[in-house]
C-alpha cells in the first residue's frame, strides 16, 4: 500500500470515528431511558435470567468449564489426549494440545472449546493463527443442550435430539477440515507435557470466574429481551421483517435466537417452527455466546476480528441446518412424539436430501472462495492476517 493510499485510509477512519462515537452515545442514552421507563420489565427479565442460570446454566455448564480448565493445567489430561495427536497434526494441522478444545468443545457445549483455546493461547501453546482457526470449529451446543435439553426434554424426541447433536458437531468439523487444507502442518513436539503449578486450585478458580461471567451475560440479554418486548421495539422489528415475507413467529424466533440461544430455542418450539431452524440457531449460537467468547480472548490478550468470527458462525449455522436435513432424511424421527410438539416435527422441510447436499456444497464453495480471495490464509476468515496476527 502506497503512502498516498495510507493517508486516504487514515483520513477516512478519522472522519468515521466521530459519527460512530455519536451513535454509541445515542445508543447509551436510549438504553438508559428504556431501563428507567421499563424498570419493572427489566427486573422481571433479570429474575428470569437468574432462574435460567440456577436451573440450567450452572448445573449443566460448570462441570465442563472446570474440566476445560483442568485440561489445560493438568499433565494427566495431556497424556490422556495424546492418542489424538496424529489426527490433530495431520488432519486439522494443529498441535496435540488442541485435542481437548475440539473434543470437549463439540461434546460438552459452548463455550467450553473457546475457553480451552483461550487458555492454550495464553499459555503460549498455540500461535495466533492456530488459535483463530481452532476457534472456528471448537464451538458447538454439545450433547447436554442439543440432545438432552432441546431434543429429549423440550421436543420429547430422542432421535431429533441426536440428529441435532450430530448435525451441530459435523458442521464445525467440516469447517475445520476445510480451513486446515490452507494451513501449515505444525512441527512434532518432542517436549514432555508440563503441568501448571497449583493445577486443581487454579482450575477451580478459573472455572468459577468463567461461570460467573457467563451468567452475567445471560442476565444482561434476558433483561434486554424483556425491555424490548415491554417497549414494543421487539414487536416493531418483527413487523418490519414480516414485510420481507417472514411470518411474525419466524421473525420473533430468529431475532430471539440471534440474541440469546436458550430463549430462542423456546420460541422456536412455542411457535412450532421446523427443526432445521433450531439447527441453524444452535450452530450460530447467538450474540450472547459470542460476547462470552470475546471476553475469554480479551483476557487472553488475543485481538479478534468480530465480524469475521460472526461470519464463520453464520456459515456454521447454515451447515448445521443442512446436516440436520440430511440426517433427518436418512434417520427420520419416530412418529410417537408428544402431541404438543407434533406441529414442529411435521412441519414442511425446506427440501430433500439433495437440497441439503446442495446447501452444504454451496457453503463450502463460499468458504473456499473467501479463503482464496484472502491470500489462501484460513485465519483471514477466522480473524487473523497473512502474517498470523489477528485483526482488530
Predicted regions, residues:
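Transmembrane helix-loop junctions in multi-pass membrane proteins
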Residues: 35-45, 73-77, 148-152, 226-238, ...
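Alpha-helical transmembrane segments in multi-pass membrane proteins
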Residues: 55, 60, 64, 68, ...
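Alpha-helical transmembrane segments of multi-pass small-molecule/ion transporters
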Residues: 65, 118, 135-139, 143-193, ...
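Alpha-helical membrane segments and immediately flanking helix-loop junctions
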Residues: 91-155, 254-270, 276-301, 309-314
Amino acid at each position: 500500500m502506497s503512502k498516498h493510499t495510507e493517508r486516504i485510509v487514515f483520513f477516512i477512519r478519522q472522519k468515521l470515528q466521530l459519527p460512530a462515537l455519536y451513535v454509541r452515545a445515542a445508543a447509551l442514552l436510549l438504553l438508559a431511558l428504556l431501563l428507567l421507563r421499563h424498570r419493572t420489565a427489566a427486573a422481571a427479565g433479570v429474575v428470569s435470567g437468574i432462574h435460567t442460570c440456577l436451573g440450567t446454566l450452572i448445573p449443566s455448564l460448570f462441570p465442563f468449564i472446570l474440566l476445560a480448565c483442568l485440561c489445560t493445567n493438568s499433565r494427566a489430561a495431556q497424556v490422556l489426549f495424546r492418542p489424538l495427536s496424529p489426527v490433530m497434526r495431520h488432519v486439522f494441522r494443529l498441535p496435540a494440545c488442541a485435542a481437548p478444545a475440539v473434543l470437549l468443545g463439540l461434546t460438552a457445549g459452548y463455550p467450553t472449546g473457546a475457553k480451552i483455546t483461550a487458555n492454550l493461547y495464553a499459555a503460549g501453546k498455540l500461535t495466533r493463527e492456530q488459535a483463530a482457526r481452532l476457534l472456528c470449529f471448537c464451538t458447538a451446543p454439545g450433547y447436554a443442550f442439543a440432545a438432552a435439553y432441546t431434543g429429549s426434554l423440550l421436543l420429547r424426541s430422542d432421535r431429533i435430539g441426536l440428529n441435532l447433536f450430530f448435525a451441530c458437531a459435523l458442521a464445525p468439523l467440516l469447517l475445520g477440515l476445510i480451513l486446515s487444507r490452507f494451513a501449515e502442518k505444525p512441527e512434532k513436539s518432542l517436549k514432555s507435557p508440563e503441568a501448571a503449578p497449583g493445577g486443581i486450585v487454579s482450575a477451580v478458580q478459573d472455572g468459577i470466574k468463567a461461570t460467573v461471567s457467563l451468567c452475567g451475560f445471560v442476565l444482561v440479554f434476558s433483561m434486554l429481551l424483556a425491555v424490548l418486548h415491554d417497549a414494543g421495539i421487539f414487536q416493531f422489528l418483527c413487523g418490519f421483517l414480516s414485510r420481507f415475507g417472514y411470518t411474525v413467529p419466524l421473525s420473533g424466533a430468529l431475532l430471539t435466537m440471534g440474541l440469546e440461544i436458550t430463549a430462542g430455542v423456546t420460541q422456536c418450539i412455542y411457535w412450532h417452527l421446523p427443526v432445521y431452524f433450531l439447527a441453524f440457531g444452535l450452530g450460530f449460537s447467538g450474540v450472547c455466546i459470542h460476547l462470552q467468547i470475546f471476553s475469554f480472548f480479551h483476557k487472553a490478550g488475543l485481538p479478534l476480528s468480530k465480524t469475521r468470527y460472526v461470519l464463520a458462525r453464520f456459515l456454521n449455522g447454515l451447515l448445521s441446518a443442512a446436516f440436520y436435513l440430511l440426517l433427518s432424511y436418512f434417520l427420520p424421527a419416530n412418529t410417537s412424539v408428544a402431541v404438543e410438539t407434533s406441529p414442529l416435527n411435521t412441519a414442511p422441510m425446506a427440501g430433500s436430501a439433495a437440497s441439503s447436499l446442495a446447501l452444504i456444497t454451496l457453503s463450502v464453495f463460499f468458504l473456499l472462495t473467501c479463503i482464496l480471495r484472502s491470500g489462501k490464509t484460513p485465519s483471514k476468515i477466522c480473524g487473523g492476517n497473512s502474517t498470523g496476527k489477528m485483526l482488530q
